[in-house]
């Protein structure tokens, strides 16, 4: 019971810290002018909309948040960077779904290259925090809640102990792999932190690349003409290639080196199909 209360205290403290960051904003715009595409508005009638900082839940909220933070970033770059990093680590550390929107926001705010570096770094650090929190507070509770799933994953890890790093890469490369579950169960599976750390850093590069570049592309699109520009089409083609390449490579390697009896032919784990969330 003590471990549960310790985790609750940490979550409450982190939540309060995020609240303070968002409540005491530096001087800047509290509203932005957006174009309403409804029938009652024209392109010459921008509507002023008051926005508040919150985690985006759809693409429209993502675009609005990106516009607001871009205004702040022009004069308060450090604040925006600290706010973004804090929000990202909050989600990753406590296994809260929704990292894809923050990856896209990273691309929109910091550009494709810097956004990718930031996203990969924060994903790795946040997932490692999740690993440490699980090891400190949640091991027995996770085993109690998911006994069959943990046992099956434990068997698969032991079968691939000699190629553990590549096995973890296999699980990370496939987009439907539940990363939150791998993060919280890794201490139970006796996966060393160095192997866990680098499997996250390398294994999620394709996923982060796709999200970050998608965010960068979306932030530059203001009309249909922008979508069909050669530059945008080339970026979308690059994203598609990156999405396909890891799966092809890891499948070829897995046939000879990995034991994947607990996985379906498409690479997804049967034992976790009911809880596939990022």
UniProtKB/Swiss-Prot annotation:
Q: Which Pfam families match?
A: VTT_dom
Signal sequence residues: 1-23
Does the UniProt entry include the keyword Methyltransferase? no
Transmembrane stretches, start-end: 78-98, 101-121, 164-184, 191-211, 230-250
Alphabetized, the UniProt keywords read: Membrane, Signal, Transmembrane, Transmembrane helix
Q: Which cellular component terms (GO) are annotated to the entry?
A: membrane
- Give the domain of life: Eukaryota
Principal location class:
membrane
Where would you find this protein in the cell?
Membrane
Please give, as recorded in its UniProt entry, the membrane topology of this protein.
Answer: Multi-pass membrane protein
Q: Which family does it belong to?
A: Belongs to the TMEM41 family.
Name the chain's protein: Transmembrane protein 41A-B
The lineage is: Eukaryota, Metazoa, Chordata, Craniata, Vertebrata
Q: Name the gene.
A: tmem41ab
């Amino acid at each position: 019971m003590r471990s549960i209360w310790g985790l609750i205290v940490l979550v409450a403290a982190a939540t309060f810290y995020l609240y303070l960051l968002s409540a005491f904003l530096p001087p800047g715009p509290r509203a932005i002018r957006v174009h309403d595409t409804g029938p009652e508005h024209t392109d010459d009638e921008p509507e002023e909309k008051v926005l508040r900082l919150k985690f985006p839940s759809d693409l429209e909220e993502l675009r609005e948040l990106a516009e607001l933070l871009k205004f702040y970033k022009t004069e308060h770059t450090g604040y925006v960077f600290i706010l973004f990093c804090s929000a990202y680590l909050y989600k990753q550390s406590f296994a809260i779904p929704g990292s894809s929107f923050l990856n896209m926001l990273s691309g929109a705010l910091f550009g494709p290259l810097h956004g990718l570096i930031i996203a990969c770094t924060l994903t790795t650090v946040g997932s490692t925090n999740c690993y440490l929190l699980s090891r400190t507070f949640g091991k027995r509770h996770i085993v109690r809640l998911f006994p069959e799933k943990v046992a099956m994953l434990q068997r698969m890890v032991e079968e691939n102990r000699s190629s553990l790093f590549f096995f973890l890469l296999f699980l990370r490369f496939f987009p439907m792999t539940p990363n939150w579950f791998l993060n919280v169960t890794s201490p139970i599976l006796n996966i060393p932190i160095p192997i866990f750390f680098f499997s996250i850093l390398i294994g999620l590069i394709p996923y982060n690349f796709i999200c970050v570049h998608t965010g960068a592309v979306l932030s530059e699109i203001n009309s249909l003409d922008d979508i069909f520009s050669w530059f945008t089409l080339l970026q979308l083609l690059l994203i598609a290639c990156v999405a396909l390449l890891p799966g092809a490579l890891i499948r070829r390697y897995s046939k000879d080196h990995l034991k994947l009896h607990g996985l379906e032919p498409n690479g997804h784990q049967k034992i976790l199909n009911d809880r596939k969330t990022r």
